[in-house]
């Protein structure tokens, strides 16, 4: 079964994240709304798609996270900031979709930490990164990868250069 099939038929959760801090309902174009509309057109019921930004109180977050853990919400979209630390909805996560590249390698780890963690019912998960070749996206992903390598070398005291 393909991951796309799981969106339409299963109770597994897809998390879509980017570095945008807020959904702007007045904006002429919203990537979140565009993705939501395409998911609905593809057969995902609208009530199974949620934006983390709509959970703007602790009570609403608690309610949303409960729905996600029960499989009532199967597509959750939001920013790295809003879907980072403190979001424990890993129970049914099957896929993480990185819509953009953050500047800091730690933000990528934070995203990955939402899905690759103890308590997830899925033994196999998928992480998708969307990059347009020949654009700043490609350069940014390469830059973040190089930053991560540098940080790892410092943390492990393993340097590729002899001293």
Regions found by a protein language model. Name each.
Residues 1-20, 147-163:
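Interdomain linker/hinge connecting the two RecA-like lobes of the SF2 helicase core
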Residues 3-53:
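Conserved helicase motor "Helicase C" RecA-like lobe of SF1/SF2 P-loop NTPases
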Residues 19-22, 79-82, 133:
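A short beta-strand-to-loop transition that corresponds to the Sensor-1 phosphate-sensing loop
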Residues 32, 62, 76-98, 104-122:
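SF2 helicase motor core recognition
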Residues 33-36, 45-80:
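Conserved helicase ATPase core of P-loop NTP-dependent helicases/translocases
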Residues 50, 97, 128-130:
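Hydrophobic/aromatic beta-strand patches that form the interior of the parallel beta-sheet core
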Residues 63-64, 90, 138-143:
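Short aromatic-enriched loop/helix-cap "lid" or pocket-rim segments at secondary-structure transitions
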Residues 103-109, 116-163:
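A conserved SF2-helicase RecA2
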């Amino acid at each position: 079964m393909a991951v796309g099939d799981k969106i339409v038929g299963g109770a597994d959760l897809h998390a879509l994240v980017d570095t945008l801090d807020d959904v702007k309902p007045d904006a002429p174009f919203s990537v979140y709304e565009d993705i939501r509309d395409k998911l609905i057109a593809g057969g995902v019921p609208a009530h199974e798609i949620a934006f983390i930004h709509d959970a703007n109180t602790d009570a609403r977050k608690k309610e949303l996270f409960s729905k996600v853990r029960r499989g009532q919400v199967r597509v959750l979209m939001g920013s790295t900031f809003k879907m980072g630390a403190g979001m424990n909805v890993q129970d049914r996560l099957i896929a993480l979709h990185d819509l953009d590249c953050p500047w800091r390698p730690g933000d990528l780890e934070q995203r990955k930490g939402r899905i690759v963690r103890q308590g997830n019912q899925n033994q196999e998960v998928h992480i998708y990164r969307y990059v347009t070749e020949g654009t700043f996206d490609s350069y940014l992903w390469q830059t973040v990868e190089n930053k991560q390598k540098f940080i790892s070398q410092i943390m492990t005291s393993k340097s590729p250069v002899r001293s």
